[in-house]
Structures are given as structure tokens and as C-alpha cells.
Regions:
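Conserved donor-binding/catalytic core segment of Leloir-type glycosyltransferases
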Residues: 7-9, 123, 167-197, 207
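A charged, aromatic-enriched C-terminal amphipathic alpha-helix characteristic of glycosyltransferases
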Residues: 20, 303, 321-354
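Membrane-proximal helix-turn-helix segments that form the acceptor-binding/catalytic region
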Residues: 47-54, 77, 91, 102-122, ...
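Carbohydrate-associated surface elements
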Residues: 128, 147
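A short helix/loop element that forms part of the nucleotide-sugar donor recognition site in Leloir-type
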Residues: 154-167
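Nucleotide-sugar-dependent
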Residues: 183-189, 240-244, 252-271, 281-291
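Nucleotide-activated donor-binding/catalytic signature segment of Leloir-type glycosyltransferases, i.e.
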Residues: 216-243
């Protein structure tokens, strides 16, 4: 079999945000590229991916996310290929935030040691993550932001869908993503919105787009607060339909806790919200600080701020008072999405791959990972 230039190992399945990024970059690579996805358990996928790497003999292994399966696959192949890690997360800092077990934290520490320490290049999505890595002594770092398809993600006319869902002329606030839940913290994605509506009896409807175990908890929370009829769960939406469902939302939320993991972490939510012309309310953390005007930013105090829903409620009340202005201000944000255009982002990543391939240094040393990974 003819060796390929780049093999992308995606820590998710087809249709995922990580998969979309990998496919986009692969199309820009000068040479053959293969994209391989997760299918089962971490251990089984690591072994299967390693076999694929050995069979394809790529010059570069591109790990999409700093995660066990893709990094372990590279190591199980003997660490013979050049390795690029593309990540928007700081695993260890996040696990410390949610109070994960010592075993999980040790695994994350080992993963970061390999991913940051043995790779030829680390691509991060924001400058704050790059600054953290530089401070830790890792200087083979480039910043390439999250991407968005500006042709596909545009504001849509959704009057009929609003009527169908009982949202006609209602102020709507949306959150899109994977709805996790952290019992030790007492919340997860979207909890601040439910609390804001419930604590202050806001005449506002919440729209949650995505799936995950946190949705059931949000439903229970809304029912306990007496606002269950104001919470609407759209479920998982195909990327091709995402703009339609986001266009249901007058306002969108990007809530990041004020701690090292969140300053490092970026998501595709912000460019997606901007591309669809949604008004964004974000915490004053990370990339949002660099992009948005002060009117869009709220303070968040520490790693878990139980008073934040009250500040959010006041802001949402102000926005609901002049809904037409809020909608117009959201549409004006679309110009900010241009810097996240996927063609530009994919070309930047492809250029980074080319630079790694051009280096004259030898391949990374062989290594093995402990059974704990």
C-alpha cells in the first residue's frame, strides 16, 4: 500500500465537530490524507487505530483532541511517526475543576506528558491556552482557532417553526452543545439559564440544542422551579440543520467558569453563534474577552459561581425589554465570524502540517504507555 501523508485520528464519530474539523483540514492537505474515527471503547479504538496507522504508514499522525485513543494509537505504533496534537481542552485542569478521582487525574497527567511533551506540534484554539503551555516550557505550539462554515451557518427565517413550537413572539435564549452534568458541582451546561429563569420568574423560554445526560437533570431542575413549560429541548441536530435551530434563539449563552481550564478551553459555540447572527451573552473568560464588546460580557467568580444566574437574569431581563434591538444587535455580530471561516482555518492547519513535514529533525523516539491508559 502506498504510504499516506497524514492520518487523522478523531476522538469522536463521523458528523462530530472534531470530525468536521479533521475532514476540512484533510481536504486542504497537499497529498493523501485519511480520517479515522472512534467506534467503541478507548482501549479497543486505540488498538484499532494503531493497526490502521501501521498499515497506512503516514508521515504524520494528527490527533484530533488530546485524548487517550488517538495518542495511545500513535504510541502503540511505536511513536515512529511525526505527531501533531490539535486540542481545545486542558484535560488535567478540567478534571481538577470537577473533582475527578485521583486515578483519572493521573491518567490525564500522563496523557498531557505524552501529548505535549512528545509531539512535534501542538495546535491550540486560543491564545490563553498557548500562553499556559509556553509557561510550562512547551514552545512547539501554534494557535489555529475553531472553524465555522459561513455558507451553511447563516441566519434563517423560522417563523413557522417558532409557531409550531409555541415560541411565536416569545423571547428565547439558547444553548447548544453536549449537555454534561457534574454532581459534585451541582450543575452542568445550561444550569445557569434554568436557574435564572426559575429564580426570577423570567418571561423567557430556554432552548437547548444537543444531547447528553445533563438534559434530564435540567428538566428536573426546571420542574422543581416551576418553569418546566419554559424549557424546550431540541435534541441532537445535524450540522446542516444547526443554523435553523439556532435561529430560534434571540440570545445565546457562552458560560465559562473563571479558572485555568476554562481560560484554556475553547468551543465551537462562539463562532457558530456569531455566524448565525445571534446575540451572545458570555462570561468574561477566554476568547470571548478578545472578541466581544463589554455589553456582551458578565463577570463569573471562581470555579463555580452560584450567584451567576442572578447576574444573568438581570442581563436577560434588560435584553427582553427591547427584543427588537437585541435581535438587531445579534445580527450585527455576524461580521465577527469571518475570522473563523473554515476555509481559512483549514488552510492554516494544512500549512502547519507542511511545516512539520519539512523539518529535518528525526522522528520522535519510541515509547510505550502504561496499562492505565
Amino acid at each position: 500500500m502506498t504510504p499516506v501523508g497524514v492520518q487523522f485520528l478523531v476522538n469522536a464519530g463521523p458528523g462530530s465537530a472534531a470530525g468536521e474539523r479533521a475532514e476540512r483540514i484533510a481536504r486542504m492537505v497537499d497529498g493523501d490524507a485519511i480520517v479515522t474515527y472512534r467506534k467503541g471503547t478507548r482501549r479497543a479504538d486505540a488498538v484499532a487505530m494503531a493497526r490502521e496507522v501501521a498499515r497506512n504508514a503516514p508521515e504524520v499522525v494528527y490527533a484530533m483532541d488530546l485524548a487517550v485513543a488517538p495518542v495511545a494509537a500513535w504510541a502503540l505504533d511505536g511513536g515512529r511517526r511525526r505527531l501533531i496534537v490539535d486540542t481545545g481542552d486542558a484535560p488535567l485542569a478540567f478534571l481538577e475543576l470537577i473533582g475527578a478521582s485521583a486515578t483519572r487525574r493521573a491518567m490525564a497527567r500522563a496523557l498531557e506528558s505524552v501529548g505535549y511533551g512528545r509531539s512535534d506540534l501542538v495546535i491550540v484554539r486560543g491564545r490563553y491556552h498557548a500562553e499556559q503551555l509556553h509557561a510550562a516550557g512547551h514552545h512547539h505550539v501554534s494557535v489555529v482557532a475553531d472553524g465555522v462554515d459561513l455558507d451553511l451557518l447563516q441566519p434563517k427565517e423560522v417563523t413557522d417553526l417558532r409557531t409550531q413550537l409555541g415560541l411565536d413572539r416569545r423571547m428565547t435564549v439558547g444553548v447548544q452543545g453536549n449537555f454534561t452534568w457534574y454532581p459534585k458541582l451541582g450543575g452542568g451546561l445550561g444550569w445557569d439559564l434554568v436557574q435564572a429563569i426559575g429564580r426570577h420568574d423570567l418571561d423567557i423560554d430556554a432552548v437547548f440544542i444537543g444531547e447528553g445526560p445533563g438534559l434530564a437533570q435540567l428538566r428536573l431542575m426546571a420542574e422543581r422551579l416551576g418553569v418546566g413549560d419554559r424549557v424546550h429541548m431540541m435534541g441532537r441536530v445535524a450540522y446542516s440543520q444547526l443554523a435553523t435551530y439556532l435561529s430560534l434563539c434571540d440570545v445565546t449563552l457562552l458560560t465559562q467558569t473563571d479558572d485555568p481550564s476554562s481560560w484554556a478551553r475553547t468551543t465551537g459555540k462562539l463562532p457558530t453563534y456569531l455566524a448565525t447572527g445571534r446575540y451572545v451573552v458570555a462570561t468574561r473568560v477566554g476568547t470571548a474577552v478578545d472578541l466581544l464588546e463589554p455589553e456582551h460580557l458578565l463577570d463569573y467568580r471562581g470555579h463555580w459561581d452560584t450567584t451567576y444566574p442572578d447576574r444573568l437574569a438581570r442581563k436577560l431581563g434588560e435584553l427582553a425589554h427591547d427584543r427588537d434591538r437585541t435581535i438587531a444587535r445579534g445580527l450585527a455580530l455576524r461580521s465577527l465570524a469571518e475570522s473563523f471561516d473554515y476555509d481559512r482555518i483549514a488552510r492554516s492547519c494544512a500549512s502547519e502540517i507542511a511545516r512539520v513535514c519539512e523539518r529535518s529533525a528525526g522522528s520522535p523516539a519510541r515509547l510505550t504507555l502504561g496499562a492505565g491508559l
